[in-house]
Curated annotation (Swiss-Prot):
Name of this protein: Holliday junction branch migration complex subunit RuvA
Protein family (similarity comment): Belongs to the RuvA family.
UniProt keyword list: Cytoplasm, DNA damage, DNA recombination, DNA repair, DNA-binding
GO cellular component: cytoplasm; Holliday junction helicase complex; Holliday junction resolvase complex
Any single GO BP term: DNA recombination
Amino acid sequence: MIASVRGEVIDIALDHAVIEAAGVGYKVMATPSTLATLRRGTEARLITAMIVREDSMTLYGFVDGDARDLFLTLLGVSGVGPKIALATLAVYDPQALRQALADGDVTALTRVPGIGKRGAERMVLELRDKIGPVSAGGGAAVGGHAIRGPVVEALVGLGFAAKQAEEATDKVLANDPEATTSSALRAALSMLGKK
């Protein structure tokens, strides 16, 4: 399978990037924070997981192997598919997710779009012993104004001026301080599209 993709970033969208490698453009699904690290026209390398279904083959890209491994571990949970696994990593970085699972924090896990209380309880039950160690420093969920940087970077990567991106992001976060990276990015794009 395809374990990584390296090449020129041809396009960046809300939920994916297209990376051209050896003359082939690979559509790679990724979290907003991963997409924020990419710049159109520059070379990039993403660690990938290839998910093959009866009717599709989809690449999911990550900044590092740790995030990819956690994504694959999440897929082992009953009822969790690639979209929910990716949404989980969009809301929580790997360290924060490990901490929530280790603490059995069902409430934190229900903040992920598509995960209800039962799904969160199932995740904790099935993954508590499978996840890697949690460092002493712990991790923080992506939330509030901690997501400002990744959202602004993603907007700039999509071609908006830095000042426009910052203003739109600040307005979105003022209206919804609990917004996730992906919801803030969507709202900012919607706001910028109306101008």
